Amino acid sequence: MGLCFPCPAESAPPSPSPEEKRAKLAEAAERRQKEAASRGILDIQSVEAKKKKKEQLEKQMETSGPPAGGLRWTVS
């Protein structure tokens, strides 16, 4: 016949503390997010560099204000 229960002399393997479980789950979630973000991208560094450059250009446009000259819109 098969065994339904473990031997009484054997104790259950120690389970990790809740803090350790949370840390492992957080690490796994971060790893999954990184993998999902880079899915389909061959060169991650170039994509990140382009993103930083775009953010810098947007920040520069915000600080410099509207360009001088050009078309003006007036409502009368």
Curated annotation (Swiss-Prot):
Gene responsible for this protein: Svip
Annotated region (Disordered), positions in chain: 1-76
Protein name: Small VCP/p97-interacting protein
UniProt organism field: Rattus norvegicus (Rat)
Subcellular location: Membrane; Smooth endoplasmic reticulum membrane; Golgi apparatus membrane; Cell membrane
Pfam family, one: SVIP
Lipidation (N-myristoyl glycine): 2
Keywords: Cell membrane, Endoplasmic reticulum, Golgi apparatus, Lipoprotein, Lysosome, Membrane, Myristate, Palmitate, Phosphoprotein
GO cellular-component term (any): lysosomal membrane
Residue numbers carrying Phosphoserine: 46
Region annotation VCP/p97-interacting motif (VIM): where it falls in the sequence: 21-33
Residue spans of biased composition, Basic and acidic residues class: 18-37
